[in-house]
């Protein structure tokens, strides 16, 4: 189907959108925004967007035909029929001001995603942790089964080489973002909740009960014939289950889970386990991802696929051949250092529970290796709100290099910066962390810290991901002579 044919088909499905031809994104370089933009480009819309810097997302969109502006300016929105904004964009942005003056409709990212989902069979994945991996696994299972879904993911699906794709079927599989409560715009047929923890609490006025109620509201956006797939291992999810008035399928390691994992064993990068489902034969599975937390993510995907009558053979093959997601326990290689060869793994996790899961997976897969973590805290508010939890989890590694907080646009908060966190961990007495005031200093410190056989884990949601790739490209002073790709 050509772009023109697809455009006309969408017009027949959504006649009310017939006058919308040009869509402009403010902050188009983010994974979530860029993913929706990519789908819209491929549906035949004229897409433009702006961001403060060029990146891989903007480069890909340029190749697809989108017009990208580096920097924000009022002129960028002049021809737009609608403007899409991310929550990271300041209301005083010149493009927002210009759109208001021109009376151009301004919608949030989730509202546009909701329109994409309106006439499709939507599968929306929400939760504090595991959204990207779970969404990627579900998309992979549906793809393996020949369902050819449209998907929008918050990270790079390695097998597809992108985080978004326009499929030919009625399925749309997407992450649902609770950070600003915008996931309440979505009206899917299937909703997944992986877990619920205190995060993005500024959105909820610091009220955890409000956060829990918002997840209940999200599940009640399902039609009465929809399905809620929820992780019964999570204490908060279990707590809210009596309040959910929709058909539920539970998953987890718990004995009372509808989709249960048994006989878990991890070896290196891979996990083996048995899945037990009501009314179905047990399946012995190989998952090409490490850690019990990823088995939970796989169980969610299995539950969704089983409910949609996807064949077991597709489930088995998709999990065994899963190629992972960018920055989710991603092996970047083995590298020679002055004191010997080390293994480099990069991970996006930036909440204490995510960091703990990553550490647990590393310990289980490589128990004999010394674990060296370079951690970059993300947001001052998160560091402040979860300060004691960060002290606890970061004390579990063998060697810690702690970078300054990546602000993500926030103003510094006294006592919630990297230096204060480093001092608090040192006072605990288990570890003597090294504070890295500037990301550029990481290259200077690592050669003295790393030892033969270490597992170096770069962790965080800020620009530490770019630093890890510089390491992998041997741009931080490491020798390239012994560089080899790590195979799972």
From Swiss-Prot:
What is this enzyme's EC? 6.3.2.8
- Per UniProt, which keywords does this protein have? ATP-binding, Cell cycle, Cell division, Cell shape, Cell wall biogenesis/degradation, Cytoplasm, Ligase, Nucleotide-binding, Peptidoglycan synthesis
Spell out the reaction equation it catalyses: UDP-N-acetyl-alpha-D-muramate + L-alanine + ATP = UDP-N-acetyl-alpha-D-muramoyl-L-alanine + ADP + phosphate + H(+)
Task: Name the residues that span the membrane.
Answer: none
Tell me the Gene Ontology biological-process terms attached to this UniProt entry: cell division; cell wall organization; peptidoglycan biosynthetic process; regulation of cell shape
SUPFAM superfamilies under this entry?
MurCD N-terminal domain, MurD-like peptide ligases, catalytic domain, MurD-like peptide ligases, peptide-binding domain
Name the record gives this protein: UDP-N-acetylmuramate--L-alanine ligase
């Amino acid at each position: 189907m050509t772009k023109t044919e697809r455009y006309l088909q969408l017009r027949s499905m959504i006649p009310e959108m017939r006058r919308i031809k040009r869509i402009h994104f403010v902050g188009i370089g983010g994974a979530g925004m860029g993913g929706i933009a990519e789908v819209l480009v491929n549906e035949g819309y004229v897409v433009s967007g702006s961001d403060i810097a060029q990146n891989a997302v903007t480069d890909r969109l340029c190749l697809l035909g989108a017009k990208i502006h580096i920097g924000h300016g009022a002129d960028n929105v002049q021809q737009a029929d609608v403007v899409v904004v991310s929550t990271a964009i300041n209301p005083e942005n010149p493009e927002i001001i210009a759109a208001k003056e021109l009376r151009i409709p301004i919608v949030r990212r989730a509202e546009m995603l909701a329109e994409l989902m309106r006439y499709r069979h939507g599968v929306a994945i929400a939760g504090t942790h595991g959204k990207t991996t779970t969404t990627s696994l579900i998309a992979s299972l549906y793809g393996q089964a020949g369902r050819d879904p449209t998907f929008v993911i918050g990270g790079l699906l390695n097998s597809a080489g992108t985080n978004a794709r326009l499929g030919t079927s009625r399925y749309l599989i997407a992450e649902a973002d609770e950070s600003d409560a915008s996931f309440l715009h979505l009206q899917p047929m299937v909703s997944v909740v992986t877990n619920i923890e205190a995060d993005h609490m500024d959105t909820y006025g610091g009220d955890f009960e409000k956060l829990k109620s918002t997840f209940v509201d999200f599940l009640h956006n399902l039609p009465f014939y929809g399905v809620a797939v929820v992780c019964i291992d999570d204490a908060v999810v279990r707590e809210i289950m009596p309040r959910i008035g929709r058909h539920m399928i539970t998953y987890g390691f718990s004995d009372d889970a509808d989709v249960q994992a048994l006989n878990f064993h991890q070896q290196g990068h891979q996990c083996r386990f048995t899945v037990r489902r009501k009314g179905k034969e047990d399946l012995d599975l190989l998952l090409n991802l490490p850690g019990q937390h990823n088995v939970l993510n796989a169980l969610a995907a299995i539950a969704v696929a089983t409910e949609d009558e996807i064949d077991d053979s597709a489930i088995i093959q998709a999990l065994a051949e899963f190629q992972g997601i960018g920055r989710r326990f991603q092996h970047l290689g083995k590298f020679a250092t002055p004191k010997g060869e080390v293994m480099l793994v990069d991970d996006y996790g930036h909440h204490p529970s995510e960091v703990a899961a990553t550490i647990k997976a590393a310990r289980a897969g490589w128990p004999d290796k010394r674990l060296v973590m370079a951690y970059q805290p993300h947001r001052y508010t998160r560091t402040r709100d979860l300060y004691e939890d960060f002290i606890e989890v970061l004390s579990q590694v063998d060697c810690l290099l702690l970078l300054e907080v990546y602000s993500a646009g926030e103003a510094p908060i006294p006592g919630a910066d990297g230096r204060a966190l480093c001092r608090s961990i040192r006072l605990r007495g288990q570890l003597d962390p090294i504070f890295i005031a500037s990301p550029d200093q990481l290259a200077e410190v690592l050669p003295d810290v790393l030892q033969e056989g270490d597992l170096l884990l770069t962790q965080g949601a800020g620009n530490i991901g770019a630093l890890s790739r510089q390491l992998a490209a041997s741009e931080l002073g490491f020798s390239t002579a012994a560089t080899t790709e790590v195979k799972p």
